[in-house]
Amino acid sequence: MPELIACLSTGKGTWGHVARLLSDNTWDKIYLITNDYGKENFTVNPKTELLSVNMSQGLKELRDEIHEKLKDKIKDTEVAVNLVSGTGKEHMALMSALLKLGVGIRLIAVTKDGVEVI
C-alpha cells in the first residue's frame, strides 16, 4: 500500500474516521497533518507520524508549512489522501502542498464496505 496523508483536525466524529482508516488498511507510512492538540491526544501506531502545523495562519503560509514538512518524507510518486477531518482551508493547503510536490493523489475514505478509493 502507498503512503497515506490525512488531516486530523476539527469535525465531530472525524477522529474516529481517521482512526478506523489507520486500522483498516496496511500503509507503508502514515502522515497526519494536525495541530499541537492532535499531536498530544491522538493515539497512533508505529507507522504513523503526526506533523503539527499552525492551523491559524493564512492559507499560503499553511500550504508552505505543510510542503516543508512533507517534502523530504514522501518516497512514492502517488499518495492516498483523506480529507474527512479538518476545514476547507486546511484541505486546500494540503492539496496545494501535495500538488506542489508533484505527487499523484488518490482520495480514500472509510465506507460501509471498508477503505475505498472514491
Language-model-derived ranges and their functions:
Residues 1-80, 89-118:
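Long, low-complexity, Lys/Arg-enriched
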Residues 86:
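Conserved TIR/SEFIR loop-to-helix hotspot centered on a Trp-containing motif
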